[in-house]
């Protein structure tokens, strides 16, 4: 293969790596769940991982049920899902 062809291949592979989203295998599956306040009426500040933005965001948790994508601190959320 010519050096031009190798450069093109290298460029395409680099572009693929940049544009390909992080695989959900990099964190637990529950990190892909949407924020869920649950049916209770409490007003608790909690954090959830937002897979599209690939960051942890705050939401209001009602205090019961919901799902596993629910953390008391942003640090706990980041350690679990955004690492």
Swiss-Prot record:
Disulfide-bonded cysteines: 31-81, 40-64, 56-77
UniProtKB keywords: Disulfide bond, Protease inhibitor, Secreted, Serine protease inhibitor, Signal
Highest taxon of source: Eukaryota
Limits of the BPTI/Kunitz inhibitor domain: 31-81
Residues the record marks as site: Reactive bond for trypsin: 41-42
Gene Ontology cellular-component annotations: extracellular space
GO MF entries: serine-type endopeptidase inhibitor activity
Family: Belongs to the venom Kunitz-type family.
Role description: Serine protease inhibitor.
Name listed for the protein in its UniProt record: Kunitz-type serine protease inhibitor carinatin-2
């Amino acid at each position: 293969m010519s050096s031009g062809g190798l450069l093109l291949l290298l460029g395409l592979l680099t572009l693929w790596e940049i544009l390909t989203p992080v695989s959900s295998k990099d964190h637990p599956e529950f990190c892909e769940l949407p924020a869920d306040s649950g049916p209770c009426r409490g007003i608790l500040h909690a954090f959830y991982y937002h897979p599209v933005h690939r960051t942890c965001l705050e939401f209001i948790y009602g205090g019961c049920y919901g799902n596993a994508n629910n953390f008391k601190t942003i640090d706990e959320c980041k350690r679990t899902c955004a690492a």
